Amino acid sequence: MRVLLQRCYEASVSVEEEVISEIAGGLCLLVGFTHTDTPETVDYMAKKIVGLRIFEDESEKMNISLADRGGAILSVSQFTLYADVSKGKRPSFTKSAPGEKAEALYDLFNQKLADSGIIVETGVFGAMMDVKIVNHGPITIMLDSDEMRSK
């Protein structure tokens, strides 16, 4: 599982030029799944994200998590996070989980985030979406469950 996390002042997602979800501040997550991801992977990543200390305290040190300060998450599915561009000029997406599996894991991931007390807004799984993000920092972090668990 890969999540591109972006701390933001605001974020929104539109489908066919209609805003379907938006947040006033917190985190925008672009979320992708691969074949080996499981519900346990989703649980691990949700807990990691909610607890990441990426907001500044009064000393301007990143020491506060979203769970500590409040805020919201805009979660957007993005199979292209598993693009393989090692051969040729066209990306291959064979490392991305099949749609049915990815959608089930995406729904579970969003539920786990919401269960932690965070407001979660989402895009539309599988849709062509326009995502607008006003980054704060900018703070952008790539989380890869395979890399994180191997350490």
Curated annotation (Swiss-Prot):
> Which Pfam families does this one have?
Tyr_Deacylase
What's a single GO BP term from this record? Answer: D-amino acid catabolic process
Keywords tagged on the record: Cytoplasm, Hydrolase, RNA-binding, tRNA-binding
Q: Which InterPro entries match?
A: Daa-tRNA_deacyls_DTD (IPR003732), DTD-like_sf (IPR023509)
What GO terms are given for molecular function? D-tyrosyl-tRNA(Tyr) deacylase activity; Gly-tRNA(Ala) deacylase activity; Ser(Gly)-tRNA(Ala) hydrolase activity; tRNA binding
- Please state the Enzyme Commission number of this protein: 3.1.1.96
Q: Which domain of life is it from?
A: Bacteria
Cellular component terms (Gene Ontology): cytoplasm
Its primary localisation, in coarse terms, equals cytoplasm
At which positions is motif Gly-cisPro motif, important for rejection of L-amino acids?
Answer: 137-138
| UniProt xrefs under NCBIfam families | D-aminoacyl-tRNA deacylase
Q: Which PANTHER family match?
A: D-AMINOACYL-TRNA DEACYLASE 1, D-TYROSYL-TRNA TYR DEACYLASE
* Quaternary organization: Homodimer.
Identify its protein family: Belongs to the DTD family.
What this protein is called in its record is: D-aminoacyl-tRNA deacylase
Gene that this sequence comes from: dtd
